[in-house]
């Protein structure tokens, strides 16, 4: 009997403390855009309004939704896609055991019950990409949905997509995804990498990581599985993912040739692209910029080629002494992408893997090629974002952003960090968040998270949480620095709650309410401490905010301005000091 993955096998949590799922009605019937509404308590009887924030958690935090992983989550986009009249259902390619990296299918593999569904593709001669619609002046439902999430006009969304400054990754075979946008004129987004390896993890664990990451705020997921059951794992993830899903197709193609890079062929890779597009992958990382002539340049590096995809293609190029087949077949790849609206994430296969290699000739040579490929993809109206480094010290970060905008004509930048130092294994979520905040401020559209396990091992769900929260901090800091019109509202609300000692509101308004409450309660667990006008850091007598309240109250009682109150209060304290003998505390 075939196994299954059920909600009982993974940890699913309701909405974050003090929050509830709300929906904003869109311009078309049935369109409901999710938000998370954070309640606030009153201040001396005066109401504090609830704060609405961007929500990526999908239906899992809706108390009215019953989680049934084997059925997948709702498909809000399905009717939008069909009513356009430019797609057709077809039989699709046959799923083979080799897709899961085995010769014979295992009866113990939990097959998704609806794997026999018919995929969609563009009708003959049609182009179904969001960029194609946008360039033809058409505002699609996905663009209207995104406009509500971002608090902007739908026409602005259309224009940003049409001009290539933003992408809306939305494969027509992933109708479960809630539309989102990646571009420097919108909220900075965060991607979370998940996926098994040859030595670790199960399908249930990877589905759990996906739900866990989106609960904490991941805007997209990349399934980087390199072990067994790659196809089946991806099917379970996509059918239950409320956010876009990306992959690196060369990983699965390599499994199909038993892990031998030189045995890769264009035909195997092409088959893998179609397989994943039919499943609903929203964006592909494709290392088409790793050219044969660039590989020798990496020989003088400290850490050589550190990208898995980049090293696979470099090995193939050197063995055959031929140009990268991803580059030579790029136009054919574009033809596949536009049939399903899969977006390009042009991979940085020659990114620096150490501070010593940052901004070197190999890295920027590849970037020049990615700029060339961007123009080709745009000729086909295929959406493109550009992947970036890597390991870069702080003083070299801005150059990366400036070069990408210039060379790649403003296409969205998607960076891994960058890590700003190499000396902190176990803390690389911090070393990279420093760089991520900076490059986000300079214009990067999406940040790929780094977990504490980077360079050390496969992250578990707790590492995923740590990585997502760390990168949400970096992304939000970048939004503030860029002057995003709504970014400061949550900061202002939390600051007000902090000054008014509304402890629960402080917890609830934070990115990780559970962690904030846990740390507070380690020293002040009593319920009364939730209304106390101090915490354990300073205690009741030395709380700066309590002293500020006292000064304001003194000013009010004595009809003084705050500065006058401080001056008068200081004089009174000086007089009191002298009258008591001028003795210091011992």
UniProtKB/Swiss-Prot annotation:
Catalytic reaction equation(s): 5-amino-1-(5-phospho-beta-D-ribosyl)imidazole + S-adenosyl-L-methionine = 4-amino-2-methyl-5-(phosphooxymethyl)pyrimidine + CO + 5'-deoxyadenosine + formate + L-methionine + 3 H(+)
Biased composition (Basic and acidic residues): 22-39
Residues binding Zn(2+): 391, 455
Gene3D superfamilies: 6.10.250.620, Radical SAM ThiC family, central domain
Residues holding substrate: 193, 222, 251, 287, 307-309, 348-351, 387, 414
GO molecular function: 4 iron, 4 sulfur cluster binding; carbon-carbon lyase activity; zinc ion binding
Presence of the UniProt keyword Kinase in the record: no
A Pfam family that the UniProt record links to this protein: ThiC-associated
Keywords associated with the record: 4Fe-4S, Iron, Iron-sulfur, Lyase, Metal-binding, S-adenosyl-L-methionine, Thiamine biosynthesis, Zinc
Region Disordered, annotated ranges: 1-58
Record-level GO BP terms: thiamine biosynthetic process; thiamine diphosphate biosynthetic process
Record keyword Iron present: yes
Cofactors demanded by this protein: [4Fe-4S] cluster
Gene Ontology cellular component annotations, sorted alphabetically: cytosol
Cross-referenced InterPro entries: ThiC, ThiC-associated_dom, ThiC/Bza_core_dom, ThiC/BzaA/B
Residues annotated as binding [4Fe-4S] cluster: 535, 538, 543
Record-annotated disulphide pairs: none
Role description: Catalyzes the synthesis of the hydroxymethylpyrimidine phosphate (HMP-P) moiety of thiamine from aminoimidazole ribotide (AIR) in a radical S-adenosyl-L-methionine (SAM)-dependent reaction.
Assigned protein family: Belongs to the ThiC family.
Protein name as it appears in the record: Phosphomethylpyrimidine synthase
Organism (species): Bacillus anthracis
Gene: thiC
